[in-house]
Amino acid sequence: MLVMSITFSFVAVALLVYFYVKVRTSFSPDAYAKTMQQEVIKMIRDIRYEADIAVQMLEKKIGECNQVVRTIDRKLTLLNEEILKEHTARTLFRASGAGQETREEVCARPEHRSAPSRAGSSAAKPTPTKRGTIEVYNEKIIRDNGLRAESPLLKDAIIALSEKGLAPEFIAEKTGKPLGEVQLLINLSR
């Protein structure tokens, strides 16, 4: 029995030493540092993973924004070309004097022979000279059919811009036409 108690004593001392070393290493500053280092490494991995996902999403959004910018740039280029064409056409139209007639030409038409003074204003009437039954005026007038003389070109430009997907408000702003007139032209073209 003595042997057994000595054996148990050695086992107890061995267990005591083992648990002492185990507790001392588990709660030592080195153990805390090692545990913290492992947690920091794990957090760094998580942050890198989340950052990679965020960068991929950001790159995707940047690509979409670049596509939208290219589309807008293409539409603005087309719009500038159309505005330049419309401005050139308007300038040529005004320079050629098209759309203007003298009162002599208007009064020479059969439908205007009976009432030559209808087109004149009451403020300052030019003096007519008689040539048979046609009164000749030297003042120039512009035919007015409800729309301006340049409206066929402008109408085509408005319709083309609306077919390209531009908003009626934007078209009205850029062409100088009222919004209602632009919307009417767009709706009539459909």
UniProtKB/Swiss-Prot annotation:
Any one cellular-component term (Gene Ontology): membrane
Domain of life: Bacteria
Biased composition (Basic and acidic residues): 103-114
Transmembrane segments: 1-21
UniProt keyword annotations, A-Z: Membrane, Transmembrane, Transmembrane helix
Record localization: Membrane
Region described as Disordered: spans on this chain: 103-130
Family affiliation: To B.burgdorferi BB0265.
Name of the protein in its database record: Uncharacterized protein TP_0711
Natural source organism: Treponema pallidum (strain Nichols)
Taxonomic path: Bacteria, Pseudomonadati, Spirochaetota, Spirochaetia, Spirochaetales
